[in-house]
């Protein structure tokens, strides 16, 4: 039992510190497989205020990691699983149109499922103090040793 707890703690420590900051996207940054899911024509790319999660990114990562089920993954013996999750933050702050792009289908599906299960709404992006749809990108890496 102690080994399971230690491995789980090691996973989450690696998960939290392996992330890159979320950056603003342009239409050119969006992969074709994401363009098929997300209605790009209704997105705003230049905003006055970025969308933000209540409690900040630490609260978002905590909620995401609590929803992430590592037992659903096809785990390699060693190496790194990588995916990039794209998701639209709607004008009401809800998360919709989620697509994970990476090499491992099981990792992509679990990342999408974990994000869909987050019920807390974002504070939406704003232009001229009006809420707008905005696309976020979150890289996700998981190390196996």
Give residue ranges: language-model regions.
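Charge-biased low-complexity segments
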Residues: 5-6, 17-145
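N-terminal signal peptide c-region/cleavage motif recognized by signal peptidases
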Residues: 13-14
């Amino acid at each position: 039992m102690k080994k399971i707890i230690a491995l789980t703690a090691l996973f989450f420590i690696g998960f939290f510190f392996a992330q890159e900051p979320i950056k603003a996207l342009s239409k050119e940054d969006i992969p074709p497989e994401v363009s098929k899911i997300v209605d790009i024509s209704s997105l705003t790319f230049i905003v006055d205020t970025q969308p933000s999660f209540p409690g900040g990114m630490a609260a978002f990562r905590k909620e995401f990691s609590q929803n992430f089920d590592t037992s659903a993954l096809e785990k390699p013996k060693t190496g790194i699983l990588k995916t990039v999750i794209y998701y639209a933050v709607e004008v009401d702050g809800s998360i919709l149109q989620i697509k994970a792009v990476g090499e491992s289908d099981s990792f992509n599906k679990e990342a999408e499922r974990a994000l869909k299960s987050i019920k807390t709404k974002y504070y939406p992006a704003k232009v001229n103090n009006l809420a707008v749809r905005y696309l976020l990108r979150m890289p996700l890496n998981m190390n196996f040793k």
